[in-house]
Amino acid sequence: MSSLSILHLLLLLLSLHAPQAQGLPLRTPRTPYSSLMEEIMDDLKKITPSPEGSLNSDEKNILANKSLLQANLKAFMTFATDTFGSDSKIMKNLKEFQPVLPTATPTEDSILIEDSNLGDFRMKLEEYLATIRGYLRHDLAAAETI
């Protein structure tokens, strides 16, 4: 093998192992995000009442806003810590999403969860997890092909 073809092979291997420098978080195969979402929802169904009512369009827009993904996660984590404790399974599972969500500076306020209202928390978290699922499926997958 010539030194030129060895060099090409080394460059190829290096490019496959180098971290992406696109400002996007890396998605790691070690954490099964769909399973985490299912665990969160299963736990919520056991400990929270079925949500009453529905989200208004403003709440849906806030939860779907990609620049608010981290800020909304923080709101859910704060509620989970205050309600279930920092070592709760829900809190630990929510924390797993921090490294894969964009850290854009929000231009709006994050979602407001009514104090001590588990139904409100559950209803908004269900919508938020659907947003994260879509983000992980489409946006990160598209970024990885760039």
Swiss-Prot record:
GO terms for cellular component: extracellular space. The keyword Signal applies. Keywords: Cytokine, Glycoprotein, Growth factor, Secreted, Signal. One of its GO terms (biological process) is immune response. Belongs to the IL-3 family. Granulocyte/macrophage colony-stimulating factors are cytokines that act in hematopoiesis by controlling the production, differentiation, and function of 2 related white cell populations of the blood, the granulocytes and the monocytes-macrophages. This CSF induces granulocytes, macrophages, mast cells, stem cells, erythroid cells, eosinophils and megakaryocytes. This is Interleukin-3. It comes from Ovis aries.
